[in-house]
Amino acid sequence: MARSSTTYPKRWNSPKTTVIRVPEIMAEDLLHIARRIDSNGGFRLREEANTLVLELMAARKVQYGSDRPVNVSSVPQRSPFRYPGGKTWLVPYIRDWLRSRYRQPNRLIEAFAGGAIVSLTAGFEGLTKHVIFCELDAEVAAVWRIVLNGQSEWLASKILNFDLTEANAREVLQGTSTELRERAFRCILRNRVQRGGIMAWGAGLVKSGENGRGINSRWYPETLARRIREINSLKDRFSFVEGDGFDLIREHQSDPDTAFYIDPPYTKAARRLYSAWDVDHRRLFEQLSRCKGDFLMSYDNTVEVVALAESFGFEYRAIAMKNTHHAKMTELLIGRNLRWLKG
């Protein structure tokens, strides 16, 4: 059961699937029930007088928890970017958070998108009706504008046909073209060949990389082209804003049917890693405290951030994850209500 505009898991489509028509007033509630069933271990129906009762069974055992890092290899990789501090590990939590709501949000706002893995997950998996994501960095924004605004095939072809050598890479990275398409390609190349995916200007090129492949160790042209094309094929589910995430939050803060995911440039190493790194964190907490809709933040696990969360009465929880060097560490999830968290 789904409306024609709704995306649902492919596993729901089988020879046993029956298509039914229901009044619009029932559609959202029925879709919510279906998603709840899909994320639980099972269900049973029983009759009581003139009432049909649906009982959800115990939730399936999940492969993550507050002290058990997510195996990121089990999570779909959808972004063309690789980021230090990327949020692929957070995807199962995002699913649980958005599915825990009684009604699906009208929109999800990701105010500091970067590689936008949360936005892409929500859009691809139909976790919200629409996704709006925002990025202040002009070079990263150039990529998203190209991917979503009709020139994705040019970028995919450029990546597929590029002869990656150190000399060719340096020529592109030292280029000064202000044309949007060229800036987008230069940004993708920079992200893929500079050490650690660091986006700040001046970072060195990869030297050894995977299996001694050097500069080619993170350059997978077929994969990058496929991801870009797949995102473009679903472009109607996304809106991209180049600008300040604070402005986007303010624009939608009075809407109770908007959910906000916030992953700002972190307080520890942001200046070294990113070009758009300077964020007023107290102002961010203040602005979210005024939002009518739900929100989820991911943050450094630091004394300063904990103090901010406590001062605004937000709940917080340390979540196990692994960094790019596979070292186990924790980050904070912060929200008004974290009772949906498992483990």
Predicted features and spans:
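Long, positively charged, glycine-interspersed low-complexity recognition regions
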Residues: 16-18, 267, 274-343
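Short amphipathic alpha-helix starts
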Residues: 18-27
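SAM-dependent nucleic-acid methyltransferase catalytic core
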Residues: 3, 67-98, 102-103, 141, ...
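S-adenosyl-L-methionine
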Residues: 7, 12-16, 35-112, 117-118, ...
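Short active-site oxyanion
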Residues: 18, 104-108, 128-130, 235-239, ...
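A short, Lys/Arg-enriched interface patch at domain edges and termini
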Residues: 27-44, 338-343
